[in-house]
């Protein structure tokens, strides 16, 4: 597919509709896509004729995340700066979306994971449906929840964000609405009518657009097996200070009242990279006290260290096992939580030495930013 057709652009009066168009790849975000999206969003913000931007995905996914295999190939070929540039552009796009002066609506009628979650959750309106599947599966890939996840996961009720970020748990549309990851739930059968109403919008007034969305929104019941029904257990366990203490708390729950959900949660943690569990927990905890810009700057430092592989090579190994060879049997190093020391974790949060082009993330100038977006120096 020609790169220019990976993001389809449609104009409907004062509305711009951007559609991810890599359905066979579940709309995995290529470098061209994130670059094009950044260019378009910046242009639309300055164009007085554009009042609203709508994001959609072709096929059964909004976006399953970043297009990671090319980045892994770059790492293996020693072209780390190319991978860093991909994340730099992607995180800048996340920042622009989180500070955007015009309303944008993301229609999440399918899979929403990783980078796809960043594009939607950093925006103003997120529309889930009965087809929505949300996850941040990074710890199983040798990575950590990024794209601003340390900001938005840390602001979910209680310690639900730690649970979602560490386990990679999948949420449906009703759960997304309940925890705040989605702003509205609209049955997929109503999307055509909703979009037709949105395309008539001649205003950037957030309240006006919210009123349109409210008219089509429903409040679905949570599935009886939903993890959101277990907030008390999640808070007891995932509020612990360390990953080791989280494991111990879950194991105590199992001895007192064993059930399939607890066992599945422990199993998900056991499959994840020990290093990435520890840096993910710290990242989310730090995110509670930081603006979204600060979170993205820190996450960029972290992802650069992950790519360099000086501390651990789990990113390449995890992607090999899950995305490339697909044997789903990663050989993590270190293999045990107790072998991941505090000093190793600390290194992920330090500035990358200014060599070979490495430098901290810098955002384009933004005007009239809310306090949540302030990108203070770390």
UniProtKB/Swiss-Prot annotation:
Location of motif Microbody targeting signal in this chain is 376-378
Q: Which UniProt keywords apply?
A: Branched-chain amino acid catabolism, Hydrolase, Peroxisome
Q: What class of enzyme is it?
A: hydrolase
Q: Where in the cell does this protein reside?
A: Peroxisome
Record pathway = Amino-acid degradation; L-valine degradation
Q: Where does substrate bind?
A: 115, 138, 146
Any one GO cellular component localisation term in the record: peroxisome
User: What Pfam families does its record include?
Assistant: ECH_2
Assigned EC number: 3.1.2.4
> Does this entry carry the keyword Hydrolase?
yes
Listed GO MF terms: 3-hydroxyisobutyryl-CoA hydrolase activity
User: What GO biological process terms does the UniProt entry carry, in alphabetical order?
Assistant: valine catabolic process
| Signal sequence, renumbered to the chain | none
> What is catalysed by this protein?
3-hydroxy-2-methylpropanoyl-CoA + H2O = 3-hydroxy-2-methylpropanoate + CoA + H(+)
The protein's matches in NCBIfam families, at most eight in alphabetical order, are given as:
PRK05617.1 (NF004127)
So what family is this one in?
Answer: Belongs to the enoyl-CoA hydratase/isomerase family.
Q: What does this protein do?
A: Involved in valine catabolism.
The protein in question is named Probable 3-hydroxyisobutyryl-CoA hydrolase 2
Q: What is the lineage of its organism?
A: Eukaryota, Viridiplantae, Streptophyta, Embryophyta, Tracheophyta
């Amino acid at each position: 597919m020609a790169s220019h057709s990976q993001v389809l652009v449609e104009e409907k009066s004062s509305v711009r509709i951007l559609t991810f168009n890599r359905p066979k790849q579940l709309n995995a975000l290529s470098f061209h896509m994130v670059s094009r999206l950044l260019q378009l969003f910046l242009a639309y913000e300055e164009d007085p004729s554009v009042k609203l931007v709508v994001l959609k995905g072709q096929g059964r996914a909004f976006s399953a995340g970043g297009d990671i295999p090319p980045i892994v190939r770059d790492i293996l070929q020693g072209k780390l700066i190319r991978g860093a540039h991909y994340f730099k552009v992607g995180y800048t796009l996340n920042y622009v979306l989180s500070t955007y002066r015009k309303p944008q609506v993301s229609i999440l009628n399918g899979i929403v994971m990783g980078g796809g979650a960043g594009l939607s959750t950093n925006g103003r309106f997120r529309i889930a449906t009965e087809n929505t599947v949300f996850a941040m599966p990074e710890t199983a890939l040798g990575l950590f929840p990024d794209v601003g996840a340390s900001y938005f996961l840390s602001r979910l009720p209680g310690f639900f964000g730690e649970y979602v970020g560490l386990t990679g748990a999948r949420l449906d549309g009703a759960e997304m609405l309940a925890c705040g990851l989605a702003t509205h739930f609209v049955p997929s059968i109503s999307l055509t009518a909703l979009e037709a109403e949105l395309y008539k919008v001649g205003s950037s007034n957030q309240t006006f657009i919210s009123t349109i969305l409210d008219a089509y929104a429903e409040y679905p019941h949570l599935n009886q097996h939903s993890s959101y029904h277990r907030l008390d257990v999640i808070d007891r366990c995932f509020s612990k200070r360390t990953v080791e203490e989280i494991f111990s708390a879950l194991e105590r729950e199992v001895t007192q009242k064993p059930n399939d959900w607890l066992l599945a949660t422990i199993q998900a943690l056991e499959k994840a990279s020990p290093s990435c569990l520890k840096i993910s927990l710290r990242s989310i905890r730090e995110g509670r006290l930081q603006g979204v810009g600060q979170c993205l700057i820190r996450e960029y430092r972290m992802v650069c260290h992950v790519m360099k592989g000086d501390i651990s090579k789990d990113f390449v190994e995890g992607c090999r096992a899950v995305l490339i060879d697909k044997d789903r049997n990663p050989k993590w190093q270190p293999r045990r939580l107790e072998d991941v020391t505090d000093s190793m974790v600390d290194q992920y949060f330090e500035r990358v030495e200014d060599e070979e082009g490495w430098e901290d993330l810098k955002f384009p100038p933004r005007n009239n930013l809310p306090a949540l977006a302030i990108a203070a120096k770390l």
